[in-house]
């Protein structure tokens, strides 16, 4: 059996990060984790571009524009949607995740879902660099792996 998998080498790649400003305290930690991983895997600082959007709901549109531009090898989406006492959380989470997946499938550019969807601020903090690792870093690793896997197909 011949096995294909992406390598973890970001040299020569260009990455866009789309980040939601809402819950910026959490999102900034995710960005830091993503940036650290990208640089550790040889993505040059000038090849990492950050695009701020007001909230998570706006992420898919900007991700689509960036993917369609063909300027980027991958788009990483980062944000934090924290459950409140209304069903708004469910609507936002569903639409953002569907929107990001749709952009990736339509554009054939890896668009990585790094948006936290948590029940509490404590859970978000845990996933932004404490107990549960940093999901921004995980998203960056996924981006690098997917770029290289696609190149090998």
Curated annotation (Swiss-Prot):
Swiss-Prot/TrEMBL keywords: Riboflavin biosynthesis, Transferase
Entry-linked SUPFAM superfamilies: Lumazine synthase
Top-rank lineage group of the source organism: Bacteria
Keyword Ribonucleoprotein recorded: no
Record field: catalytic activity: (2S)-2-hydroxy-3-oxobutyl phosphate + 5-amino-6-(D-ribitylamino)uracil = 6,7-dimethyl-8-(1-D-ribityl)lumazine + phosphate + 2 H2O + H(+)
Cellular component aspect of the GO annotation: cytoplasm; cytosol; riboflavin synthase complex
Pathway note: Cofactor biosynthesis; riboflavin biosynthesis; riboflavin from 2-hydroxy-3-oxobutyl phosphate and 5-amino-6-(D-ribitylamino)uracil: step 1/2
Annotated Gene3D superfamilies: Lumazine/riboflavin synthase (3.40.50.960)
Active site residues of this protein: 88
Binding site residues for 5-amino-6-(D-ribitylamino)uracil: 22, 56-58, 80-82, 113
Enzyme Commission number(s): 2.5.1.78
Cross-referenced InterPro entries: LS, LS/RS, LS/RS_sf
Listed GO MF terms: 6,7-dimethyl-8-ribityllumazine synthase activity
Residues annotated as binding (2S)-2-hydroxy-3-oxobutyl phosphate: 85-86, 127
Function: Catalyzes the formation of 6,7-dimethyl-8-ribityllumazine by condensation of 5-amino-6-(D-ribitylamino)uracil with 3,4-dihydroxy-2-butanone 4-phosphate. This is the penultimate step in the biosynthesis of riboflavin.
Family, as annotated: Belongs to the DMRL synthase family.
Listed HAMAP family: Lumazine_synth (MF_00178)
Protein name: 6,7-dimethyl-8-ribityllumazine synthase
Organism of provenance: Fusobacterium nucleatum subsp. nucleatum (strain ATCC 25586 / DSM 15643 / BCRC 10681 / CIP 101130 / JCM 8532 / KCTC 2640 / LMG 13131 / VPI 4355)
